[in-house]
Amino acid sequence: MSSSARGITLLCLLLIVSSTVLHFSIGGGSNGEKRRDDGDGDGDDEKVRLLLGANALGERDRRHGHGHGGGVSSAPAPAPAPARAHLPPPLLHKNARLPDPVPGRVGLGHRRGNATAAHRRRSEREGKKSTPLVVVAAGAALSGAAAVLLVVLVVFLACRRFQRRAMPGADQSGTNKVSFDPGPDVFYLDAVKPYVEADHGGGGGVVKTAPELAGPKEEPRCEEEDSGVALSDDGADSVHSSCCFHSSHFSYSELRDTKPGSNGVSPSPSGRSRRRSSAPVTPSEKNKAASPYSPQCPRTPSNRERSSRAHSPSSSVSDLTSVSTSVVKDHEVRRAVHSLMFPEAQSGGAGHVKEDEAESGNMRPPPPPPPPPPPPPPAVTQQQDVKTSCGPAVPPPPPPTPPPPPPLLAPKQQSSGGPILPPAPAPPPLFRPWAPAVGKNGAPLPKLKPLHWDKVRAAPNRRMVWDRIRSSSFELDEKMIESLFGYNARCSTKHEEVQSRSPSLGHHVLDTKRLQNFTILMKAVSATAEQIFAALLHGNGLSAQQLEALIKMAPAKDEADKLSAYDGDVDGLVPAERLLKVVLTIPCAFARVEAMLYRETFADEVGHIRKSFEMLEEACRELMSSKLFLKLLEAVLKTGNRMNVGTARGGAMAFKLDALLKLADVKGTDGKTTLLHFVVQEMTRSRAAEAADIAAGLGAELTNVRKTATVDLDVLTTSVSGLSHGLSRIKELVGSDLSGDERNQCFVAFMAPFVAHAGEVIRELEDGERRVLAHVREITEYYHGDVGKDEASPLRIFVIVRDFLGMLERVCKEVRGAKNCHGGNPALNLNNV
């Protein structure tokens, strides 16, 4: 229970007790006053009745005496009255009604005296009755004030809790409580402090005193211990939780310096764990077990809370933060404190793990601990004070390295207090663990590009081909393989490529996007500004690829004006702008680039055009001289006239070659034999030749026809006209634009012979173009008759013949297969093919 809850409970109990006491005191006082008033009233009434009774008796005697005298007589002389003896008052019933006294007599004086006394008693009674009312009013006011104070306190606590939740470190508020009960570790540190100071002379780290090292959290630690006891009951305890709890008395810096021999277990076992390992613990004792450092512990957390705490990295970090009270930064001091406090951790650090494992018995293996967060950056100062809940939040250090999991099943004799058997040795690994490879000289080998494969386990009882491989039979060329498949070279190359792709732009004149394009093209040129300047002056020295990139770098008119008007430092410009500014200083610079590119590509263009012209001429000659193609046309003509008998299409003397592509669309009654199949069968029967011979013969006779079908005559004619137009611009550049300046004489002298030679070649190409067009028109008229303007393409006839030859080869193959299978009439057996 928190301190605020205790305060509220105590205040409520105090109010209840005070109200009860006040109530009983008021009630008792009022009852006593009432009883006293009743007693006084009864006594007064009795006295009045007695007095009234005595007077009545005297009057009655006097009346009786006067009557016995027998008449009216003068009153006797007064005589001294004898002394009346004090008679006891008559015994009358308290409810007896006495006669009224005679008015004007002694009774009146007596009533007057009684009235004064009654008035005094009534005023006293009213004063006594008003006293409890005042006390009740005071108690009510006190209760109201206490209630208002309680409401104010509750509202203040609620606001404070809301503020804590809203703070960034609110999630750690539950773990930042500080207990005033110091643990045993404080006395340990105080005991070893003189030895540490004597060994190190007070230098290095600073050991904190007991008030600073007091256990910061008693309640979370009790919860951890109780959770550990509960886990041992249901078989869900683990070495990780035990080790994390025992190591909570030390800082993370000490945990980080634990030697490997301790297997990651903290050397600070609790007294409870030692007693558990020495004697068996009954379930009743487990339920009564508590931490020796905290005598009063809260409730034991449930299994769900323990599982969430065990599997949550944030909870483990917060628990470690809450119990870590100081950080000793000096390495030597930490090791000295560690060795003096827990000498058994150096030799048998793993013994506590074995004891916990022996106690766990036949417990189920716990789930693996979550991976620890990355370690924090190194601290700058040598001493860090642990902040409580009143101070600012401190970033929690990461948890220690989790210990290895316990064995799956422990022997039963260990749970009954028997000797602890050593664990069985681990099985040999399937593959050797990875280790950094080293070369012959001991230097580590560079990492290469991996080859992904599946390893094969060696079978000891089976002979394999891999057993015959000798390790010394093959040696690698390390330099070659590193140069080809090394990561460093490739990464450096990629880094250079990335830098080249995204260059840093300095001072520039042109637009940024346009300048980036110029920079990319400049990389394709791969030449300096001086080399390009010299090549443009002389007319040679650059390849076709470089000239094409330079042509693409030609700036617009406004861009050229900006670069020409720039009169600043040329070296301050980016490389692309500097190159353009140097090039623009040459007269007709980009016209020269076009002329040089024309000269470089002229020979290739002319060769392609001449080859196409020659192929067209050969194709025309093949179509006019092919005899087998003529026989095929004859067979198709006769078959078509037979099928068109009685129609307007019958009796034809010729047909356009487009009809050859329709022969495969006319199918027979069997649904598979086409008209082309019939024509091929008739040709093989009449000529006593194989169908394959027909297809092969036509393919050999019409070889160039198939090639010509891929030629576009319009492209050829456009190429010839383009060459002629380019030569005209070069003549204009050399003859007029560059003829007046002496600096241009080198370029003019170099281009003049080429201009003369190119003129002659272009004239030959123009003559060849006219000749080829004449042949194409002639072959088209040879097959189709008069060709009008409706002819879409002069070379369409070559495309038709190429497609028909492909269909013919397929049909001839089918006919030959049907004939080989059945040996009879292939037309009758074509359905079985």
UniProtKB/Swiss-Prot annotation:
It holds the Pfam family FH2. Residues 108-122 have a biased composition (Basic residues). GO terms for biological process: actin cytoskeleton organization; actin nucleation. InterPro entries: FH2_Formin, FH2_Formin_sf, Formin-like_plant. Keywords: Membrane, Signal, Transmembrane, Transmembrane helix. Residues 438-833 form the FH2 domain. It is a single-pass membrane protein. Residues 26-130, 199-234, 254-326, 340-435 are annotated as: Disordered. GO terms for cellular component: cytoskeleton; membrane. The keyword tRNA processing does not apply. The chain crosses the membrane at residues 136-156. It is found in: Membrane. Residues 1-19 form the signal peptide. Belongs to the formin-like family. Class-I subfamily. This is Formin-like protein 2. It comes from Oryza sativa subsp. japonica (Rice). The lineage of its organism: Eukaryota, Viridiplantae, Streptophyta, Embryophyta, Tracheophyta.
